[in-house]
């Protein structure tokens, strides 16, 4: 009997030992889920690259439940701290609108497969949607996220480098598109449309060609310009990527401006820039989320890209600012300043009675 009790006791101890070992093994094999739920990253907590260059003004929300798969949400966010030294008043209201990471996508969401590496996750892959392809790679932990995306947008007829169209006074061809028709009886300048065309051909075109050399529409949706800041032919600078992007939709070109990137560039040169620059840029905030719609006509190696009155007239109120008028008139030859000032003086009435207004660029494929 004692032997039987001893045997049973021994078996119970052995079973308890193996059960404990089994529990320990299961405990060791269950890796805790990092960042369970949603975690948002922006500003200094986010290192985002579009192509090979940093992309500012964006926010990313990362979420996972099992630590094996996750969801990433990318969108734009406007950081008011970047313009604190540029705004003329601390009471300025800063709009919270911004374009997304990928041109034409206010919000981009995609799923990722996660690999745990210590206290962080790594992920990489390809996401295709809306005719574009995005390759991505990144890491995320409890304090920060790094993400690099390389995007190839759908092919379009604007891809490549374009020069400003050459000016031809005999045919009226000009790099600048500017036509303006108003029915106002109070116009004292003969023929508003003719005056606008004259302004474009004689003043704006020569000024523009001094500063702007070429415009390149890239496969990733970036727009890059070569220019001369001093207006010298032998001086050539290239604008940074991720300042301006574009996409084509329903026959229109949508221009997206990255306000954070632009204002960061302004802030880097703020000794040369008035506070007015930032406030003017902010007037475009209502168009930032989806982009500024522009007409785009391409034929035989030429392109006409222009805004019409539906877009321009609400923005022309900016020209009522005395500071802006002074800046523009200062660039006009002294002998023509009186005529240009007369146009600005009549601007409010012109806006009310305008039936046609087109402004933009004529380009030729390089």
Give the positions of each predicted feature.
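Polybasic, proline/glycine-rich intrinsically disordered low-complexity segments
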Residues: 114-153
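N-terminal glycine/threonine-rich, aromatic-flanked beta-hairpin/loop signature
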Residues: 53-107, 175-267
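Short, hydrophobic/aromatic-rich segments at coil-to-beta transitions
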Residues: 32-42, 67-72, 116-125, 159-161, ...
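Amphipathic hydrophobic-ligand
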Residues: 50-60, 102-111, 130-136, 237-242, ...
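Short, exposed beta-strand/loop patches in secreted or surface proteins that constitute
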Residues: 58-66, 111-116, 137-140, 213-218, ...
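Mixed-charge, low-complexity intrinsically disordered segments
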Residues: 83-97, 170-208, 256-355
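Tryptophan-anchored aromatic micro-motifs
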Residues: 30-57, 152-203, 362-365
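Bacterial Sec-dependent N-terminal signal peptides
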Residues: 1-6, 10, 14-41, 137-160, ...
């Amino acid at each position: 009997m004692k032997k039987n009790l001893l045997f049973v006791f021994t078996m119970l101890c052995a079973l308890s030992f193996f059960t404990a070992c089994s529990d320990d093994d299961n405990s060791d094999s269950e890796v805790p889920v990092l960042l369970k739920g949603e975690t948002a990253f922006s500003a200094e907590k986010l290192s985002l690259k579009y192509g090979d260059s940093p992309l500012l003004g964006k926010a990313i929300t990362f979420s996972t439940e099992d630590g094996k798969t996750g969801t990433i949400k990318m969108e734009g966010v406007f950081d008011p701290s970047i313009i604190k030294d540029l705004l003329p008043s601390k009471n300025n209201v800063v709009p919270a609108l911004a374009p997304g990471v990928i041109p034409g996508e206010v919000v981009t969401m995609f799923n990722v497969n996660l690999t745990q590496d210590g206290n962080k996750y790594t992920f990489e892959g390809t996401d295709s949607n809306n005719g574009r392809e995005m390759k991505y790679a990144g890491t995320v932990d409890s304090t920060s996220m790094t993400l690099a995306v390389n995007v190839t947008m759908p092919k379009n007829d604007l891809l490549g480098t374009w020069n400003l169209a050459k000016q031809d006074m005999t045919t009226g061809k000009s790099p600048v598109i500017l036509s303006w028709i108003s029915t106002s009886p109070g116009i004292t300048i003969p023929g508003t449309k003719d005056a606008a065309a004259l302004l474009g051909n004689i003043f704006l075109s020569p000024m523009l060609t001094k500063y702007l050399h070429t415009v390149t529409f890239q496969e990733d949706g970036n727009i890059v310009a070569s220019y001369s800041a001093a207006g010298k032919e032998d001086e050539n600078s290239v604008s940074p990527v991720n300042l301006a992007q574009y996409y084509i939709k329903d026959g229109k070109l949508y221009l997206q401006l990255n306000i954070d990137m632009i204002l960061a560039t302004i802030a880097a040169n703020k000794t040369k820039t008035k506070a007015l620059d930032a406030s003017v840029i902010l007037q475009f905030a209502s168009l930032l989320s989806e982009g500024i719609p522009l007409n785009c006509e391409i034929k035989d190696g030429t392109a006409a890209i222009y805004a019409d009155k539906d877009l321009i007239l609400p923005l022309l109120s900016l020209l009522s600012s005395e500071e802006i008028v002074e800046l523009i008139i200062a660039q006009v030859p002294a002998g023509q300043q009186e005529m240009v000032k007369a146009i600005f003086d009549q601007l409010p009435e012109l806006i009310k009675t305008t039936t046609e207004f087109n402004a933009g660029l004529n380009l030729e494929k390089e």
